[in-house]
């Protein structure tokens, strides 16, 4: 299941993300962060980390360097 989710994120990165203006305030991007978090911590914990990261990616947060720890 983990590999299916990562595959779907990679499809998003390849086909949908290039059509949208850059909007992620973080490095690595939220989608790349999600791949790394799910790969390292599994679908449950990595998924929660990904959701929390996406919720923080907004105009009220300065963003910056935020790697998966």
Curated annotation (Swiss-Prot):
Keywords: Cell membrane, Membrane. It comes from the Bacteria. Pfam families: YidD. Its main location: membrane. GO terms for cellular component: plasma membrane. It is a peripheral membrane protein. It is found in: Cell membrane. Could be involved in insertion of integral membrane proteins into the membrane. Belongs to the UPF0161 family. This is Putative membrane protein insertion efficiency factor.
């Amino acid at each position: 299941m983990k590999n299916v989710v990562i595959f779907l994120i990679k499809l998003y990165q390849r086909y949908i993300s290039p059509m949208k203006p850059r909007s992620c305030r973080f490095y690595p991007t939220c989608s790349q962060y999600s791949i790394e978090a799910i790969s390292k911590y599994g679908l449950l914990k990595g998924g929660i980390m990904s959701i929390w990261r996406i919720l923080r990616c907004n105009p009220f947060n300065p963003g910056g360097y935020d790697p998966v720890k």
